[in-house]
Amino acid sequence: DTLVIATADHSTGGMTIAKGKDYKWNPEAIHKMKHSGMYMTKEIAAGKDPEKVINEGYGIDFPSKQMDKVKQAAKDLRKLQKEGKDDKDPKVAEATTKLQNAIQEPINDASHTGWTTNGHTGEDVNTYAYGPGSSKFKGNMENTKSAQNIFDFFKNDVTSNQNQQ
C-alpha cells in the first residue's frame, strides 16, 4: 500500500566514457580509488595536507606536475580562508572548484572519462516507481508531470485501487 518513487530533477556532468582517440574506457582506474575527488577536496579544504590526502585517496600514481597544481590550488583556497572568506563567497567556491578539478584530472585521464560540463545537462532522467499508482510514472514525461502525479497521489486514495500498479 506504499508508492515508492526514485527520480532526479536533472542530470549533471555529461559523462563521456572512452574519451580520446583510442576509444577505450578504463574503469579499473576508478575502482582503485579509495576516496572520491569530492571527499579529498573537502579534506584538503578543511586544512589537511594535500599530498597526504592524495596519496591515501588515490589508488593510482598521481603525476607530480598535477600534485603541484593541487598544492597551488590548496594554497590559493587557504589564503581566501585566512582572509575570513567562507564557503558562500564566490571566490572560495571558484577556488574550491579549481582544487577539485586538479584532483579529478588524473583519474579522468587514467580512466579515459570525459565531462561535457560541471553543470546541469539536458538528457532525460530515469524515474522508477513501485506500488499503487506507479503506472502514472511509466514512459517519458515532463518533470512537471511527475510532480503533478505526486500531488494527485496525495489528493486521491490510490491505495484502495490496486489496479493502478
Language-model segments: which ranges?
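A post-motif C-terminal structural segment
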Residues: D1-Q164
